Amino acid sequence: MNIFTLLFIYFLSDTVAAYCYYGTEYKNATGCFQFFRTPLNFTNAVRFCRVNMKSTLVRPTSSIRNQQIRGAALKLGIEEYWIGASNVDNDWEWLDGSMLTYSNFDVGGGYPKKTESQIGAVSMSSLAGLWYTKLDAMFLPFVCEFPPSTVYDNGILYRSPKTQSLIFPSAGTKAALLMVDAVDQSRLYSKNEIGPLKTEAETGEKVYLKPINISTNGFPEFSGPPIVILNPYKRKIKVKPVMVSQTETEMSRSRKEKEETEDSINVKSLKEGGTARGNGSSVAEELNSNSKEKREREENETIRSKTIQISRG
């Protein structure tokens, strides 16, 4: 049984309020596209995009678009793939019947060439972005393209720009396989696997898990609501602890206790000395002076204690 491996690439825009299917690339508000590595012939590739993805084979309608698709294919390591152009009796046109207003055939290599069958197809090379004519019976990887949307469609998971809120489908059943959506998708997936790698914890973003089923014909079917988890390894800013300094009141309290001890010693000494010398009045005057100085210090300490600030380290 062939299992299609879905390949994941980046969003290029975070500002437009539109959504793309899960696992696709958003391109300047003009559409979304998705690569499939499993090779199909041209007819079945067209059918797969239309039936399973509700889309069409990608149409590189400009040089900019052509380079965008080529760059994504290079990143994924896909050398050649079907695009949405074909011919009937050597009239080359897009799948919707419109004429090719832009093309990038390898003219130096003699393309486009006449095909041996009545219907021919067009492939694109990621090495130079050039187009080639092929027999439609050949098997190649392919790219589906579809317009962006603002709603969900029957269990398919869309993703939005960072500033937008995601709305999840509510119906469906869970499946054994899960698909993961996060910011750095190239680090979450290898080229031939479905499932998260260990580095998903390093993205620092929400991770969206989407159940999928693999049907008997090998086509992936999306079903069930996504499971949203918060990345437990999201980077956190360390906050320094609050350090409360020793207040002036606390410092003065210890100083006051020391002074009171010294005063009691001085009073005792003065009394003993004054009695011996007969200078009782001098002792009283000195004690009054000391008491006055202590009251003034206490008043100043009270004022300073009201202006104490808690300092933070």
From Swiss-Prot:
Q: Where is the C-type lectin domain?
A: 28-145
For this protein, the record's InterPro entries field holds: C-type_lectin-like (IPR001304), C-type_lectin-like/link_sf (IPR016186), CTDL_fold (IPR016187), Snaclec (IPR050976)
Q: Name one GO molecular function term.
A: carbohydrate binding
What SUPFAM superfamilies does the database record attribute to this sequence? C-type lectin-like (SSF56436)
Coiled coil, from the record: none
User: Where is it mainly found?
Assistant: secreted
Record keywords: Disulfide bond, Glycoprotein, Lectin, Secreted, Signal
Disulphide linkage map: 49-144
Task: Tell me the compartments it is located in.
Answer: Secreted
Give the glycosylated residues: 28, 41, 213, 279, 300
Query: Region entry Disordered: which residue ranges?
Result: 244-313
Q: Which GO terms describe its cellular component?
A: extracellular region
Keyword Hydrolase set for record = no
From the UniProt annotation, give the residues forming the signal peptide: 1-17
**Biased composition range(s): Basic and acidic residues:** 250-259, 291-304
Q: What is this protein called?
A: C-type lectin domain-containing protein 162
User: What gene is it encoded by?
Assistant: clec-162
